[in-house]
Amino acid sequence: MSNRKYFGTDGIRGRVGNAPITPDFVLKLGWAAGKVLARHGSRKIIIGKDTRISGYMLESALEAGLAAAGLSASFTGPMPTPAVAYLTRTFRAEAGIVISASHNPFYDNGIKFFSIDGTKLPDDVEEAIEAEMEKEITCVDSAELGKASRIVDAAGRYIEFCKGTFPNELSLNGLKVVVDCANGATYHIAPNVLRELGATVIAIGCEPNGVNINEEVGATDVRALQARVLAEKADLGIALDGDGDRVIMVDHEGNKVDGDQIMYIIAREGLRQGQLRGGAVGTLMSNMGLELALKQLGIPFSRAKVGDRYVLEKLQEKGWRIGAENSGHVILLDKTTTGDGIVAGLQVLAAMVRNHMSLHDLCSGMKMFPQILVNVRYTAGSGDPLENEAVKAVTADVEATLGNRGRVLLRKSGTEPLIRVMVEGEDEAQVTAFAHRIADAVKAV
């Protein structure tokens, strides 16, 4: 990815009004993508967005660029990222485009592409789009210009898809669920899915105004959800992020249930039902408790680099079906092609109903290890702290002390001059002290 000028691991993202998230850039991106995608034959593109106010501006720019290249755009309106992937497949569109910055604040936005099969665009297509970006815009003949239309039943189609991933013989009757939609793209989807499956639903974070997406709500901040679950005496809470590709849950006691625990529940249930193919993929940040719990069940476990893109690559490499990040990206390849918060949440609910167990009890087979993360800022250009001998020595000493009952992970942030120091083990006081000891060594570089 290092030779890319615009595309990162998750499309193109930035602050609105600053390059590259400007109207003129996005118009040209639409044109360049249109030129490349038109070579493949189909001339239909699906465009969805989350609830950021800048989405209106950016979808108009994309539409203009695509039309100039001769491609027609079909708009879904606010729609979760996994819904756009699904609709791209079912409409046999050449590509799907999502305008979203996921869990970021409203003043950020981004552009992400899906291919005709609902997966990420191949690298060679992204590279071809970047090459077109270097050319001057030329407009096709007037008779060949693209058109724009709306998919009026997009939400209904996706709601039915989500419900179809929940076992027909089960229902959510009798369950009280609080769902937090982060004032994002699932606000008109998730509550309806749960209600139509029989649950009593209390919805929060479902009043988007263009600037409140992810603001003290959603998968990145579950405090409001925890409080509401306790106040309503609900059976559980479900928190989605701004574009609906992450899910974090809350049990009836108000305890947070993260992506590692969600994957454990789904993998164990798959094993019980005889439906688990192969093992499970986590990341370098996945809790050691997950690895040990899966090992006890005889389920193979593999770690990918941090990022749902790398989880998906590892799943494809191994031919496995289930992967997750502790941040709540859960990928279930037997159900969908990308991380889907609603679909993952439904599989946990199915396990609860089928086993007559609370979410709290479903998590009890996995003991979470204390995991301490310290971010240390360093001066870019002053040498690599990870190659420093003193840092290496302290890290080796901590690893030797922890043995096979803990882990140390040092990695650079992909976006800032930060070293992330993570120490994990059985004793919280010990791992906290170890994390700060390593962090102090990094600071001294």
UniProtKB/Swiss-Prot annotation:
It catalyses: alpha-D-glucosamine 1-phosphate = D-glucosamine 6-phosphate. GO terms for cellular component: cytosol. The active site is at 102 (phosphoserine intermediate). The modification Phosphoserine is found at residue 102. Mg(2+) binds at residues 102, 241, 243, 245. Its cofactor is Mg(2+). Binds 1 Mg(2+) ion per subunit. Its EC number is 5.4.2.10. InterPro entries: A-D-PHexomutase_a/b/a-I (IPR005844), A-D-PHexomutase_a/b/a-I/II/III (IPR016055), A-D-PHexomutase_a/b/a-II (IPR005845), A-D-PHexomutase_a/b/a-III (IPR005846), A-D-PHexomutase_C (IPR005843), A-D-PHexomutase_C_sf (IPR036900), A-D-PHexomutase_CS (IPR016066), Alpha-D-phosphohexomutase_SF (IPR005841). Keywords: Isomerase, Magnesium, Metal-binding, Phosphoprotein. GO terms for molecular function: magnesium ion binding; phosphoglucosamine mutase activity; phosphomannomutase activity. The keyword Isomerase applies. GO terms for biological process: carbohydrate metabolic process; peptidoglycan biosynthetic process; UDP-N-acetylglucosamine biosynthetic process. Pfam families: PGM_PMM_I, PGM_PMM_II, PGM_PMM_III, PGM_PMM_IV. Activated by phosphorylation. Belongs to the phosphohexose mutase family. HAMAP family: GlmM_B. Catalyzes the conversion of glucosamine-6-phosphate to glucosamine-1-phosphate. This is Phosphoglucosamine mutase. The lineage of its organism: Bacteria, Pseudomonadati, Pseudomonadota, Gammaproteobacteria, Enterobacterales. The gene is glmM.
